[in-house]
Amino acid sequence: MVENEKTSVEETEEKAETEDEMLTEDPSNEDSDEANEEGNELSEEEKRIAELEGQVDELNQRLLRIQADYDNFRRRQREEKEAAAKYRAQSLIEELLPALDNFERALLVEPEQEETKTLLKGMEMVYRQVSEALKKEGLEVIETKGETFDPHLHQAVMQVEDAEFESNEIVEELQKGYKLKDRVIRPSMVKVNA
């Protein structure tokens, strides 16, 4: 029995030695350890690459936003510059409109004397010159005769009921209105049919 116990202990020891030898001699075990280390290194490198790619994408998005902002800024600057050039004479024209109105009122007077007729002709020539110069700058008279009332172009100061005119039609112009290019600088004061 002692002999049987010996053999089973010996067998167990032999098995353990063989397993140890197999473990130390098995190159696949060493490779798997190295592979695990390399896998860890690769996964860390892959994480770093993914992180850097994310940063690159974020920077590209920021760059695109900055470029879009800059393009919008340049467009606004250009539009403001064009508008300033387009309407540069607006304040001067607005100051001249009352004088132009007075010229028109003076030209409506019927002269009684020859001297007054000559003076009136001279005033008419000056009025035409000033009107032409303002037209070249883009000043236009807002038409009212036979037009339908438009609150963007006209200012209704009186309302009448007249069967000869359609509803909302302008009956009479009380003061001329003007546009500078496409901008209304003074609406026409009108009498409108109800």
UniProtKB/Swiss-Prot annotation:
Gene Ontology MF terms: adenyl-nucleotide exchange factor activity; protein homodimerization activity; protein-folding chaperone binding; unfolded protein binding
Main subcellular location: cytoplasm
Key words of the record: Chaperone, Cytoplasm, Stress response
Entry-linked InterPro entries: GrpE (IPR000740), GrpE_coiled_coil (IPR013805), GrpE_head (IPR009012)
Composition skew (Acidic residues), residue ranges: 10-44
Segments for region (Disordered): 1-53
Subcellular location: Cytoplasm
Any GO BP: protein folding
GO cellular component: cytoplasm
HAMAP family per the UniProt record, alphabetical: GrpE
Subunit structure: Homodimer.
PANTHER family from the UniProt entry: GRPE PROTEIN, GRPE PROTEIN HOMOLOG, MITOCHONDRIAL
Role, per record: Participates actively in the response to hyperosmotic and heat shock by preventing the aggregation of stress-denatured proteins, in association with DnaK and GrpE. It is the nucleotide exchange factor for DnaK and may function as a thermosensor. Unfolded proteins bind initially to DnaJ; upon interaction with the DnaJ-bound protein, DnaK hydrolyzes its bound ATP, resulting in the formation of a stable complex. GrpE releases ADP from DnaK; ATP binding to DnaK triggers the release of the substrate protein, thus completing the reaction cycle.
Family designation: Belongs to the GrpE family.
The protein, known as: Protein GrpE
Protein's gene: grpE
